[in-house]
Amino acid sequence: MLYSKPKQLVVINIYCDRILSIFPNGTLKLVNYSKLKDGAYAAKLMEGVSPNVPMRSGVLGVFAIVLEFCAYAALAAYAYQKAPLYGAILFAGTTFACIVSSAYHLKCGLAEYMFLKYGRDERAKGMMLDLMGSGASLRLCSLGMITFYITLMVAIITGAIGFPIWALVFTILPIFIVMFPLQIVGTLHIAAMVSMLGWMFLI
């Protein structure tokens, strides 16, 4: 059985992603992410934000990712009953994605915390950018999710796990394509959470 509170799961994930990018003076989007290198832009954008906000996002985000793992592991277990190979790949993909994305989410929250805590000046900006630039391998968290969904799509198309072909609508790709023009930070993660609502009706 999938996690029984999918709406709460989606809300927690979206909330944790969005409070890292929505500020009183504007919203950080993918298209202007590189502007964070400009200390004046970052300081103005995050003016008035408490350091507790990114830390709250970090802690709640990891909690949400744990719930996410439970949901996707349940989907992998269901697939394993029908096709063990596909199920094993799905489980490996979601395990890798959730473990690495937990570390990545905490790192992003800590980077913003340091910038806000130490005065939003050039030194604080340098500390933030150094931290965000470190541990580049953590960005591979999306690799696990991509592996998961490619495997799931193949399993659906081949009929190996018994889902109808229209179940492809609930995979992450259609939702990601719809959301991408919005340039929301955390689009892949949010799309993955929204897709989980669909699987509640199929399992």
List the model feature ranges, each with a label.
Residues 1-203:
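Hydrophobic, aromatic-enriched alpha-helical segments typical of multi-pass transmembrane helices
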